[in-house]
Amino acid sequence: MGLLSTVLAVGVNLQTHTPVSEVSSTPDSEGYAAVKTERGILRAKKVVYATNAYTAALLPDFEGKIIPVRGICGHIVPTEKPTRSLSNSYIIRQGALEYDYLIPRQDGSIIVGGARSRYFHDKNNWYQNVQDDELIESAESYFDGYMQRMFRGWEESDASTAKVWTGSK
């Protein structure tokens, strides 16, 4: 039995895609916190915050303690030309603070993240930045031709970047 099944079986009310705008700082007379959401106010004896980069927005005590940083990832898709498949996840370290990571998918595509050398010099692009709705422009093309540059046996492949996105952690 998975974790989700286990917690639902004991009555946990798991809310997903439900932004919380406020949590009461003191419980009511029955020991419940009021959790204000777009769906209404929920009552909870325990609240678990799973917010990563956005923690300080709900918990001001964490301002300056949890600092959001932005990164960039790409989805590389091989074409019909034969390529060597990757059977493991990889970290490619190019310097002390410069590395990329690759996660092969079952369909032969690859998730790759990194590109730090393209944006690290401009702190506003990544430090204390939660702008997930816009790409880091200076790194947007980093994954183009990545497999051809980095892996033997991929030089003649037509593997290309299908998608690029950014995220905060």
Stretches with model-predicted labels:
Residues S21, Y54, S117-Y119:
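Short, solvent-exposed loop/turn segments at secondary-structure junctions
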Residues M1-K45:
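Helical element adjacent to the flavin cofactor pocket in flavoenzyme catalytic cores
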Residues T37-S85:
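Central helical "cap/lid" subdomain
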Residues D61, K65, E80-S168:
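Active-site lid/adjacent beta-loop-alpha segment flanking the redox-cofactor pocket in flavoenzymes
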Residues G2, Y54-A56, I91:
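Internal mixed beta-strand/loop scaffold within catalytic domains of large alpha/beta enzymes
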Residues L14-T16, T37, Y49, V112, ...:
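General beta-strand structural signal in soluble alpha/beta enzymes
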Residues T16, G31, R70-I72, E98:
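Residues that flank catalytic or metal-binding motifs in active/ligand-binding sites
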